UniProtKB/Swiss-Prot annotation:
Keywords: Glutamine amidotransferase, Hydrolase, Lyase, Pyridoxal phosphate. In the presence of PdxS, forms a dodecamer of heterodimers. Only shows activity in the heterodimer. PANTHER family: PYRIDOXAL 5'-PHOSPHATE SYNTHASE SUBUNIT SNO, PYRIDOXAL 5'-PHOSPHATE SYNTHASE SUBUNIT SNO1-RELATED. GO terms for cellular component: cytosol; glutaminase complex. It comes from the Bacteria. It catalyses: aldehydo-D-ribose 5-phosphate + D-glyceraldehyde 3-phosphate + L-glutamine = pyridoxal 5'-phosphate + L-glutamate + phosphate + 3 H2O + H(+); L-glutamine + H2O = L-glutamate + NH4(+). GO terms for molecular function: glutaminase activity; pyridoxal 5'-phosphate synthase (glutamine hydrolysing) activity. The active site is at 75 (nucleophile), 166 (charge relay system), 168 (charge relay system). SUPFAM superfamilies: Class I glutamine amidotransferase-like. InterPro entries: Class_I_gatase-like, PdxT/SNO, PdxT/SNO_CS. It comes from Staphylococcus carnosus (strain TM300). This is Pyridoxal 5'-phosphate synthase subunit PdxT. Pathway: Cofactor biosynthesis; pyridoxal 5'-phosphate biosynthesis.
């Protein structure tokens, strides 16, 4: 399958590497037209306000709001997918959750953890950098996949996967592989 990484900011190369390690083709997505050429899209981390500005500038918001393309958001990508952000309205509103930005602290408070992620594995390496967490799940359709210190850090809803951390900054590509082999593949199979 062909999986795109929104290449406006963030760890694009690292996500592409994880896609390739998963046995699939990775594509840097820089133009809206490319969305029609891919089976799924990864929204990388970075700074969510900047990411939203760039998505507006290049026309991605409208295209993605109106799309059922499977999407995987990491860190800032999770924030972009959320229905609500504490204190403001969400952006793409694909995951029926409320997120809180920087809830684990500032840059100096960054940390790594080994997570038990439902349906994937109990030893997933995760890097948290100014990470958000999922404050609230707003629907029974959202499946909680993992928590850290009683904070929700990974969820799935339909075609969408969101995590608070940066799986791409480790050598462990199983979260990306799960997105492709389960969420994207199921969507593609259902569309046939």
């Amino acid at each position: 399958m062909k999986i795109g990484v929104l290449a406006l900011q963030g760890a694009v190369r690292e996500h592409l590497r994880h896609i390739e390690l998963s046995g699939h083709e990775g594509v840097s997505v820089k133009r809206v037209e490319q969305l029609e050429e891919i089976d799924g899209l990864i929204l990388p981390g970075g700074e969510s306000t900047t990411l939203r500005r760039l998505m507006n500038l290049y026309g991605f918001k409208e295209a993605l709001v109106n799309s059922d393309l499977p999407m995987f958001g990491t860190c800032a990508g999770l924030i972009v997918l959320a229905q609500d952000i504490v204190g403001e309205e969400g952006y793409l509103q694909k995951l029926d959750i409320t997120v809180e930005r920087n809830s684990f602290g500032r840059q100096v408070d960054s940390f790594e953890a080994e997570l038990d992620i439902k349906g994937i594995a109990n030893d997933i390496e995760a890097v948290f950098i100014r990470a958000p967490h999922i404050e609230k799940v707003n629907s029974d359709n959202v499946e909680i996949l993992s928590t850290v210190d009683d904070k929700i850090v990974a969820v799935k809803e339909g075609n969408y996967l969101g995590v608070s951390f940066h799986p791409e900054l480790t050598d462990d590509y199983r979260v990306t592989q799960y997105f492709i082999d389960h969420i994207v593949a199921e969507h593609k199979h259902a569309a046939v």
